[in-house]
């Protein structure tokens, strides 16, 4: 089993034929004041709550979550809670990011579609595990900021585009996995159509909280596509911003 707390420096090389991040063992980076917080996040929020995939744990322990949140919230970046990122949107709590990523069952050759780029954090985690990530964001300012952050961190296997998540990204379909980070009222069949047979769709579905204070009701669905249709593998109560 990979030790998720080993010190590595990730190098994203455009010369790698598969676009897979290369790992170089390095001494602990004393210049990173958040390294110990990431380690504690993985130990206390993820492993203790059942996240087991060593590749997911390693990715969560490497991606600098504090660089995907507003600067005045960086001291809260590794807490077990969502945080606002502007425009009425949030970055999901670390456990939800890890849970959805693990549910997607990614391999180093996977091609992934993300609906709802937001800050770009989920896309970065996916990029550590997959060959290529395509991410759609409805809000142009968030799409631009996420692309800038991802590029600055060296991610060459992520492409971000402003667009309507309900339409997906048919040019690159079929996808091995599709993750949706906002809640539609029902499962978008267009996204299932863009999923490869054997692929997984992870999507929160249901009503979002209303301005009047009603809580709403949502479930995180894990749907696996088969040659005959699709099979639901799980449903868990969650609370996401609405998909619009």
UniProtKB/Swiss-Prot annotation:
Family: Belongs to the methyltransferase superfamily. L-isoaspartyl/D-aspartyl protein methyltransferase family.
Taxonomy of the source species: Bacteria, Bacillati, Cyanobacteriota, Cyanophyceae, Synechococcales
Subcellular location field: Cytoplasm
Entry keywords, A to Z: Cytoplasm, Methyltransferase, S-adenosyl-L-methionine, Transferase
Active site: 92
Listed EC numbers: 2.1.1.77
Gene3D superfamilies: Vaccinia Virus protein VP39
Catalysis performed (reactions): [protein]-L-isoaspartate + S-adenosyl-L-methionine = [protein]-L-isoaspartate alpha-methyl ester + S-adenosyl-L-homocysteine
InterPro entries (alphabetical): PCMT, SAM-dependent_MTases_sf
Species the sequence originates in: Synechococcus sp. (strain JA-2-3B'a(2-13)) (Cyanobacteria bacterium Yellowstone B-Prime)
Region (Disordered): 1-39
GO biological process, one term: protein repair
GO cellular component, one term: cytoplasm
Classification via Pfam families: PCMT
Matches recorded under HAMAP family: PIMT
Role of this protein: Catalyzes the methyl esterification of L-isoaspartyl residues in peptides and proteins that result from spontaneous decomposition of normal L-aspartyl and L-asparaginyl residues. It plays a role in the repair and/or degradation of damaged proteins.
GO molecular function, one term: protein-L-isoaspartate (D-aspartate) O-methyltransferase activity
Membrane spanning stretches: none
Protein's UniProt name: Protein-L-isoaspartate O-methyltransferase
PANTHER family: PROTEIN-L-ISOASPARTATE O-METHYLTRANSFERASE, PROTEIN-L-ISOASPARTATE(D-ASPARTATE) O-METHYLTRANSFERASE
Domain of life: Bacteria
């Amino acid at each position: 089993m990979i030790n998720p707390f080993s010190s590595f420096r990730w190098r994203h090389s455009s010369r790698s034929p598969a676009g897979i991040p290369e790992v170089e063992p390095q001494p602990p980076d004393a210049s990173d004041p958040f390294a110990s917080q990431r380690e504690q996040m993985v130990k206390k929020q993820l492993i203790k709550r059942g996240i087991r995939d060593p590749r997911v744990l390693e990715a969560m322990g490497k991606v600098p979550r504090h660089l995907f949140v507003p600067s005045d919230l960086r001291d809260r970046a590794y807490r077990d809670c969502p945080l606002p990122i502007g425009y009425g949107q949030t970055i999901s709590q670390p456990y939800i990011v890890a849970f959805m990523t693990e549910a997607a069952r990614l391999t180093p050759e996977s091609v992934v579609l993300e609906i709802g780029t937001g800050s770009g954090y989920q896309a970065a985690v996916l990029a550590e595990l997959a060959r290529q990530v395509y991410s759609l964001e409805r809000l142009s300012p968030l799409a631009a900021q996420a692309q800038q952050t991802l590029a600055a961190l060296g991610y060459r296997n992520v492409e971000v585009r402003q667009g309507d998540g309900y339409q997906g990204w048919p040019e690159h379909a079929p996808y091995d996995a599709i993750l949706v980070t906002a809640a539609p009222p029902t499962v978008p069949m267009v996204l299932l159509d863009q999923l490869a047979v054997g692929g997984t769709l992870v999507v929160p579905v249901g009503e979002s909280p209303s301005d009047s204070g009603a809580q709403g009701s949502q479930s995180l669905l894990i749907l696996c596509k088969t040659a005959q249709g699709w099979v639901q593998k799980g449903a868990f109560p969650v609370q996401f911003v609405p998909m619009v």
